[in-house]
Amino acid sequence: MDLSNLLDFPSILPEDIQVIAPTSYAKLSLLSHCQHLKLFIGQQGSKGVCAHSRVLEEKLEAVKEVISKIIETDKILEKSEKFL
């Protein structure tokens, strides 16, 4: 019985993932990040308060701040490009 084809299966990850996460470590880190995002989404519906939920809420607020700063910077750059 040939068992070599048991390890041959199509990837469930999109091919573009190589650009974002070229190494196995980066892919695992990305998976961890996705799990945190899933937890954040779940946290929106619950009102449980514990040390872990406070930490997650603080991380979520930090991510929101970073994203808002990126958007703010993009708007400033777009306005400056119009003047050039």
Curated annotation (Swiss-Prot):
Keywords carried by this UniProt record: Host nucleus, Viral genome packaging, Viral release from host cell
One family name in Pfam for this protein: Herpes_UL33
Entry's localization field: Host nucleus
Gene Ontology process terms (BP): viral DNA genome packaging
Task performed by this protein: Component of the molecular motor that translocates viral genomic DNA in empty capsid during DNA packaging. Forms a tripartite terminase complex together with TRM1 and TRM3 in the host cytoplasm. Once the complex reaches the host nucleus, it interacts with the capsid portal vertex. This portal forms a ring in which genomic DNA is translocated into the capsid.
Oligomer status and interactors: Associates with TRM1 and TRM3 to form the tripartite terminase complex.
The protein's name in its UniProt record: Tripartite terminase subunit 2
Source species: Alcelaphine herpesvirus 1 (strain C500)
Organism taxonomic ancestry: Viruses, Duplodnaviria, Heunggongvirae, Peploviricota, Herviviricetes
Gene: TRM2
